[in-house]
Amino acid sequence: MGVAQHRQSKSRVRKRRAMWKLTAPNHIECPQCHKPKMPHHVCPSCGYYKAKEVISMGE
C-alpha cells in the first residue's frame, strides 16, 4: 500500500487534480429520424446505426 514519504503542498495536489473534470456527453443528430443520439451508438428512437436498421422498433 502506498504511503506518502513527504507532504505534498496544496498547489502540487491541485495541479495534479486539475485534469479531473467531467465532460458533458456529446450528442449528434440521427440522420434517419433527426433526434439526438450518442455518437457510435444505435439510435434509441428509430433503431438505425450507419444507415442500417439494427433494432426493429415495431411501430
Swiss-Prot record:
Coiled-coil residue spans: none
Stated family: Belongs to the bacterial ribosomal protein bL32 family.
InterPro entries in UniProt: Ribosomal_bL32, Ribosomal_bL32_bact, Ribosomal_zn-bd
Any single GO CC term annotated in Swiss-Prot or TrEMBL for this entry: large ribosomal subunit
Keyword line: Ribonucleoprotein, Ribosomal protein
Gene Ontology molecular function: any one: structural constituent of ribosome
Name of the protein in its database record: Large ribosomal subunit protein bL32
One protein family per Pfam: Ribosomal_L32p
GO process terms (BP): translation
